[in-house]
Amino acid sequence: MAKQKIRIRLKAYEHRILDQSADKIVETAKRTGATISGPIPLPTERTVYTVLSSPHKFKKAREQFEMRTHKRLIDIVNPTPKTVDSLMKLDLPSGVDIEIKL
């Protein structure tokens, strides 16, 4: 495999789980002899929902809820076949969304 790059994007609502998953991926890739760039923290997406706190009246009384989506980016440069196999077998928590591009 000459000059290939695997780009892994991780998304999660909790940053602790996200960082643990990124550390697992980096450790696995380093153990197999690949060169790694990252984890790079990307901007956090913040979605705010405003709802009325009373069912009928009192329009001024409102509550705001927010969801934060944390993101990380990991680049694996010159991956070996062993790296790809070990990444496929890696078990990550269910709260982490993974996108892999070759």
Swiss-Prot record:
MF terms (GO), sorted A to Z: structural constituent of ribosome; tRNA binding
GO CC annotations, alphabetized: ribonucleoprotein complex; ribosome
Matches recorded under SUPFAM superfamilies: Ribosomal protein S10 (SSF54999)
One Pfam family recorded for the sequence: Ribosomal_S10
Keyword Ribosomal protein found: yes
SMART domains in the cross-refs: Ribosomal_S10
Alphabetically ordered keywords of this record: Ribonucleoprotein, Ribosomal protein
UniProt entry tagged with the keyword Ribosomal protein: yes
A single BP term in Gene Ontology: translation
Lineage top rank: taxon: Bacteria
Assembly: Part of the 30S ribosomal subunit.
Family assignment from sequence similarity: Belongs to the universal ribosomal protein uS10 family.
Function: Involved in the binding of tRNA to the ribosomes.
Protein name per its UniProtKB record: Small ribosomal subunit protein uS10
Organism listed in the record: Pediococcus pentosaceus (strain ATCC 25745 / CCUG 21536 / LMG 10740 / 183-1w)
Gene: rpsJ
